[in-house]
Amino acid sequence: MRLDTNSNVDFKAFESSSSSSSCLVKLDNLATWGGSQKTDTRLPITDYSTLGGPRHNRSPFPLSKDVNNRLVIWDGDMTTLDVDAITNTSDETLTESNIISERILAVAGNQLREELSTNVKECRTGDVRITRGYNLPAKYVLHTVAPTYREKFKTAAENTLHCCYRNVLCKAKELNLHTIALCNISVHQKSFPADVAAHIALRTIRRYLDKCTLQVVILCVNSNERGTYEVLAPLYFPRDQLEERSALWQLPKDIGGEFGEPQHPDPDRQIRIIRNPQHSVHMRHGHTDDDSDVSPHDMEGNSSDLEYGAKDMNGLSPNSYSSGLQTQLQRDLDRQHLLSDRPRAGVYENVISEGVEGIEHQERYERLLRRAQVEDLTEVSGIGCLYQSGVDRLGRPVIVFCGKWFPAQNIDLEKALLYLIKLLDPIVKGDYVISYFHTLTSTNNYPSLHWLREVYSVLPYKYKKNLKAFYIVHPTFWTKMMTWWFTTFMAPAIKAKVHSLPGVEHLYSAITKDQLEIPAYITEYDMATNGLHYFNPVPTAS
C-alpha cells in the first residue's frame, strides 16, 4: 500500500540528489506486514487454545487489515528509502558514532553535520530534534536519544524508550508526514534487552497506527534483529484469527497504556529498599538531621532560588511527565508513612534496617575509595575545575567547582568520580560547603542527569548530612529548573541547602573575599554583568 506524500517544503538539493540515486527504494517495492503472510516460510503458529487459561480474556490488539497494511518490517539500508522522514539514534550531543548515525551522516553529507553542531547542538534523552535530510532521499531526519539500561532503573529506562518512539511518531504527525522509517532506537545500547526493546517498539507503533490512520511506518532492522521482530510482531499485529487468539497466551501481562507506555502492574516492582530510613523520616517532618545555611539572598527577602515550575523544559505541564515520576513520589510518601513511627536505632540496628543493599552500597564506595588512592588521576586534577579554597566564616572547608573547566564530553567520567571521592573523603567527615560557578558554561560542560544520579547514589550519607550549603553562582533559568527537578525528585535531602546567587559578591556574606580563590574569567564576567560593589554583604550569624 502506498500513500501519496504531501510536503509543503521544496528542497532542490534533495530533488537533484534523489533523482540521480540508482538505489532508491520506493514504498511500492516493500511488502507490508499484512501482505507478508503470503510469503511467510516459518512453521505454522501453535494453537494455544488447548492449554490452560490465557493471560488476557480478550484481544488487546485485535486483527486490523488496515493497520497491518500500514506497517513494514524491513531488513535494509534506511538511507535509501524514499520516505518523508527517517530516524537517527545518538547520544545527547548528537556526536556519537554508531552504525546507524554514521551511515546517515555519511549519506546526508557535511551540511547535516554542520546543522547538528551549530543549530541543534544537543538532544536530551527521550526527546526528538528535527533536521533536513540534505543528500538523503528522506526530506527530514528525526534525531532521538535512547536511555541507558540498568536493571536497578529498568522502569525508567523502559518508560524513556517508549517516549523516544512516541515523540518521534508524534513529531511526524505534527509535520503532516505520511511515511516514516524507524530504526531500532536502542540498537547502540548493548545493555538494553532486545526482547524488551522490541515489545516497547511494536506496542507503541501499534497504538500510534490505531490513532493515526494516514501514516505508514517502516521499521528498519538488521538481519540479527529481524527474527525477534517477526516473532513478536504477530502479538501486536495479528494477521489472522489464529495469531490473534494465540496472542492471548503469549502477550506479556504489561500491555501498556493508551499510548503503549509501560505500566508495570506487578506491585513487587514498586518496592525499593531505603538506604537511610531515618533521614527519610526527618525529611517527612520538614527538617534534616542538620541545619542548612540560610541563603544570603533569603536574608535580603529576595530569594533567587527556583521554588516552583509550572512547565518542564519542553513546555509540557507537570501532568505530562512520565508516570514513573508520579509513581516515585507516591512510593516515597508510602515508605515514609510506614517508617514514621520507627524509633531511632543504634549503629547495628541501622545496618540491619538498611539491609543487604546498604552494605553493598558501602562496599562499593570503599572499593572506589581504594582505587582513588592508588590510581593516577592527574588528567582530572590537572584540569583545575574542582579544588578546596579556604574556609567560610564558620571555619568550614569551601569546595569550588568551575563548570566551564569541566569537559564533561571529553573526560573519563569514572576517573572524575574517583577524583571527587579522593578530594572530598577526608573533608566530608565534618561540615563543609560547595560553591559551584555556572559562569560561561556550555552544553559541552553538562554531564547527563543519569551520571549525576549515579554519583549521588554512590556517595555515602555523610556527604549529604555534612554538606551545609551548596551555592550556585551565575545560574541560568535552565540551571534553576534542573536544580529544582533534581533536588525534588532525586535528591530531596539537600534541597534546602541549595541556594542560587546572581553574583560573586553575594557569596561574601558566607565566605570572606580572601578565602575565595576563583579564576579571573569569573570575576571579569561578574563585573561586566553586575558592575562593582553591587551588594553589601552581611555576615551570616549561625
Swiss-Prot record:
Q: From what superkingdom does this record's organism come?
A: Eukaryota
| Residue ranges of domain Macro in the record | 58-237
Query: Which InterPro entries does UniProt cross-reference here?
Result: CRAL-TRIO_dom (IPR001251), CRAL-TRIO_dom_sf (IPR036865), Macro_dom (IPR002589), Macro_dom-like (IPR043472), Macro_GDAP2 (IPR035793)
Residue ranges annotated as compositionally biased, kind Basic and acidic residues, are 286-300
Q: Which cysteines are joined by disulfide bonds?
A: none
Which part of the chain is the CRAL-TRIO domain?
373-530
Residues of the region (Disordered) are 277-304
Q: Record's SMART domains?
A: A1pp (SM00506), SEC14 (SM00516)
Q: Which family does it belong to?
A: Belongs to the GDAP2 family.
- PANTHER family the UniProt entry points to: GANGLIOSIDE INDUCED DIFFERENTIATION ASSOCIATED PROTEIN 2-RELATED (PTHR11106), GANGLIOSIDE-INDUCED DIFFERENTIATION-ASSOCIATED PROTEIN 2 (PTHR11106:SF72)
Name of this chain's protein = Protein GDAP2 homolog
Q: Which organism is it from?
A: Drosophila pseudoobscura pseudoobscura (Fruit fly)
